[in-house]
A protein has these predicted regions:
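A short, structured loop/turn motif at beta-sheet edges
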Residues: 18-23, 78-83, 108-118
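Short acidic, gly/pro-rich beta-turn/loop elements at beta-sheet edges
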Residues: 24, 69-72, 129-133
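Residues at beta-strand starts and edge strands
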Residues: 6-10, 23, 56, 84, ...
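General N-terminal targeting signals
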Residues: 33, 77, 134-136
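Short amphipathic beta-strand and strand-loop transition segments with alternating hydrophobic
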Residues: 1, 46-51, 75, 104-111
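Glycine-rich portal/gate segments that line the openings of hydrophobic small-molecule binding cavities
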Residues: 45-98
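Hydrophobic ligand-binding cavity/cleft-lining segments
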Residues: 1-56, 65
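Beta-strand/loop substructures that line and gate deep hydrophobic ligand-binding cavities in soluble
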Residues: 91-149
C-alpha cells in the first residue's frame, strides 16, 4: 500500500474562450443546476448545495465511481473566483456495504492571454481508516480497491 493512502488522482484541463476576468468558479460551482452537473459526466447522478453545521458552503454530489455509488459531501475550504478547494468525507456504497473515502476537489482558472484561460479540475481520493478496515474485512487488497476506481 502507498504510504499516502492515495486511491486515485485525476486532473482535467480545458480551455475557456473567455477572459479570466469573466470567470467565477465559486459562483458557477455553488449555483450549478443539477441538470448541468449531470451533463458533465454520464457517471453524475445529481448535485445540490447546502451549508455545513458551521455555516460553510457545501455541494452534495452523487455519482458512480467503479462499482460504488458515491455520495460526496464537499465542504468549501477556499471559495474564490479563480480557485476553490473543497474536502469531502464521502460515502462509498458498494455491493459489500458502505464505507468512507476522503476526497479533495480543487478547481482553478488561470490566464492564458487576454481572451482565453485554462480551467483545471483536480480530484484526489484517499483511503480513510474506516475504508482500510472495510477492505480488510471484505478480503480486498488496497491495490484491488484502487483499481476499482
Amino acid at each position: 500500500m502507498t504510504s499516502d493512502r492515495t486511491l486515485s488522482i485525476s486532473t482535467v484541463t480545458h480551455i475557456i474562450n473567455a477572459p479570466l476576468e469573466k470567470v467565477d468558479i465559486a459562483d458557477w460551482l455553488f449555483n450549478l443546476p443539477d441538470a448541468e452537473y449531470q451533463r458533465c459526466s454520464r457517471a453524475h447522478i445529481g448535485a445540490g448545495t447546502t451549508t455545513s453545521d458551521d455555516g460553510r458552503p457545501m455541494t452534495i454530489n452523487v455519482e458512480t465511481i467503479g462499482d460504488a455509488l458515491m455520495v460526496q459531501h464537499f465542504v468549501s475550504e477556499v471559495r474564490e473566483s479563480k480557485y476553490c478547494r473543497l474536502v469531502s468525507i464521502s460515502d462509498a456504497i458498494t455491493p459489500k456495504g458502505r464505507t468512507k473515502v476522503q476526497v479533495v476537489w480543487e478547481l482553478s482558472a488561470k490566464k492564458i492571454n487576454d481572451h482565453t484561460c485554462e480551467y483545471s479540475n483536480h480530484i484526489h481520493a484517499r483511503a480513510t481508516d474506516e475504508f482500510l478496515a472495510f477492505i480488510e474485512k471484505n478480503g480486498v487488497t488496497f491495490e484491488q480497491a484502487r483499481a476499482a476506481r
